[in-house]
């Protein structure tokens, strides 16, 4: 009985310590993302998700999903690509499909080339994307030899409302987000780190 009580007390202490660490990380993440968002114009924030982020550890998933600032950052990346910090957008004409990648240089190479988003901003599917308010979804994507990424989709319905199309896509290095969550850097330093 003594050993069981001791183990229970230890488990409680560990759980409380983990909870405190999670709350601290959540605060740091929001501070960091608030700093980043302060220099942007967020067009809108949609709180609906098609599915929860699937990632380990669970606390990381919960923190990212709970952060309205993270969702705002996704909106910024998707719809307000007027800033040099967003390095590249790829587009395949005619198939209503586009990709936006926030990656380290040379991690992902797209054979379709890299284009300035401003060059395709007037394409019909981009205009429609900005005019509709549909559903966001998260999923986790593992790339062999290239690390792990959070994979973010922007979904919308087609004109006939009969099928969904993944029009834009963001991949962010999981290790970079984890580093942000655990970092003791100032928000300014975190912003510089993320944008690097």
Regions found by a protein language model. Name each.
Residues 13, 25, 47, 56, ...:
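Alpha-helix boundary/capping residues
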Residues 79-84, 89-172, 179:
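Extracytoplasmic/periplasmic ligand-binding sensor regions of membrane-associated signaling proteins
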């Amino acid at each position: 009985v003594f050993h069981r009580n001791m183990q229970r007390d230890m488990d409680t202490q560990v759980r409380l310590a983990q909870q405190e660490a999670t709350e601290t990380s959540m605060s740091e993440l929001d501070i960091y993302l608030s700093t980043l968002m302060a220099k942007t114009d967020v067009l809108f924030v949609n709180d609906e998700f098609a599915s929860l982020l699937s990632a380990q550890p669970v606390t990381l998933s919960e923190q990212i999903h709970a952060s309205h600032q993270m969702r705002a950052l996704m909106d910024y990346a998707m719809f307000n690509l007027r800033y040099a910090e967003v390095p590249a957008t790829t587009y395949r004409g005619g198939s209503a499909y586009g990709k936006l990648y926030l990656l380290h240089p040379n991690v992902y190479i797209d054979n379709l080339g890299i284009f300035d988003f401003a060059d395709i901003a007037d394409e019909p599917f981009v205009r429609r994307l900005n005019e509709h308010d549909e559903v966001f979804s998260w999923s986790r994507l593992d790339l062999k030899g290239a690390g792990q990424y959070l994979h973010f989709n922007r979904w919308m319905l087609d004109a006939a409302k009969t099928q969904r199309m993944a029009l834009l896509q963001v991949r962010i290095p999981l290790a970079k987000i984890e580093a942000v969550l655990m970092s003791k850097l100032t928000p300014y330093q975190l912003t510089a780190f993320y944008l690097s």
